[in-house]
A protein has these predicted regions:
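N-terminal Lys/Arg-rich, disordered targeting/topogenic segments
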Residues: 1-20
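Short, low-complexity N-terminal intrinsically disordered segments enriched in polar/charged residues
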Residues: 42-85, 89
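Solvent-exposed serine/threonine-rich low-complexity stretches and specific carbohydrate-binding patches
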Residues: 247-258
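Short, hydrophobic/aromatic beta-strand segments
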Residues: 224-233
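Exposed beta-sheet edge and beta->alpha loop/turn motif
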Residues: 136-217, 260-261, 268-317
Length: 317
């Protein structure tokens, strides 16, 4: 009797039973697939986290030099973290005080300059940072720093809202001070080069992560206006190294008026060259190979003018 009832029930509801079975099978398949995906993602995240932990070694220099000692790194990181906290807390004056004297003088002469050109560009919101030793030698350590928005305070991360800079600390300094804005160090030189027409004094060298800049005084020892270069190309002002490698000047940042020197007068020019800090080539001379001896005559007939001279200015003793 019971078997008959069951048989009749199945016959009367065969379609419903079939649909239910299909739904259960589909549900089981979905659960299995979801479990596999979750497991894979969990393993991937674990592997990724482990890889990042293993690969991120902030004391190992990426470009040049020995790894930074743990004690030195912790000391440097404390100073950099202090700078960041001052900026996040809008304590601009204390952040500015942490800049080295040379950094202030060359890049941010006033606190308003620092506020406008650095602070307001980066710290429009609370930031955190990622630090990596970049270049290290006996005198200094350069760190690459990436400023990102603070996810703990915003809950968001935006790859487009990341700022990169290089921060340098002088190992020989007993002060808590930093170089920012890619500037690594400044060095007084006062090296003199003389010719019959020109006396040149290389006053100072400013070294950046990717460039070298020289401040030069040019004395005109003639009775004509001298033009140090026509700026028609970037091949006539070159930085030469010990192995004769040549680096061109950024002539687009030089004004013609700065290259004009009146008779018996002295002018000052700053010239920057694209020479990386990591290069092991030693800078030797700056070569001016197209100096116009008589600018007035040149202006009158530049096409036929040919009274030019050259000079190699020493940048090392």
């Amino acid at each position: 009797m019971i078997r008959v009832k069951i048989s009749n029930f199945i016959k009367n509801n065969i379609n419903k039973i079939r649909d239910l079975g299909i739904k259960l099978i589909i549900a089981a398949i979905i659960i299995i697939i979801a479990t596999i995906i979750l497991s894979t993602n969990r393993n991937h995240k674990t592997n990724s986290d482990n890889y990042e932990k293993e690969s991120y070694k902030p004391t190992e220099t990426i470009i040049q030099g020995a790894s930074v000692k743990k004690e030195q790194y912790e000391k440097d990181n404390n100073i950099i973290n202090k700078f960041l906290e001052y900026c996040n807390n809008k304590d601009i004056s204390k952040a500015y005080e942490l800049l080295s004297m040379d950094c202030k003088k060359e890049l941010y002469p006033t606190i308003e300059d620092f506020k406008k050109y650095y602070y307001e560009t980066i710290f429009d919101k609370e930031r955190t940072y990622n630090l990596q030793a970049w270049i290290s030698d006996k005198k200094y350590t350069v760190y690459k720093i990436r400023y990102t928005n603070n996810m703990l305070s915003t809950g968001l991360y935006n790859e487009d809202d990341v700022y990169q800079d290089y921060i340098t600390l002088n190992k020989k300094s007993n002060k808590e001070e930093i170089f920012i804005g890619n500037l690594v160090y400044c060095e007084e030189l006062n090296i003199i080069t003389k010719t019959k027409e020109i006396e040149a004094i290389v006053i100072k060298k400013k070294v950046y992560v990717s460039d070298e800049e020289y401040e030069i005084k040019i004395k005109n020892n003639t009775d004509k206006i001298i033009l140090m270069d026509t700026l028609q190309n970037n091949k006539n002002i070159r930085l030469l190294t010990n192995d004769k490698t040549e680096y061109g000047a950024y002539t687009n940042s030089i004004f013609m008026k700065d290259l004009l020197v009146e008779p018996w007068q002295t002018g000052t020019i700053s010239i920057k060259f694209k020479k990386n800090l990591s290069s092991d080539k030693k800078s030797k001379v700056i070569q001016f190979s197209n100096i116009i001896k008589d600018y007035i005559t040149y202006k009158e007939n530049s096409q036929n003018y040919n009274d030019v001279i050259s000079i190699q200015i020493n940048v090392e003793d």
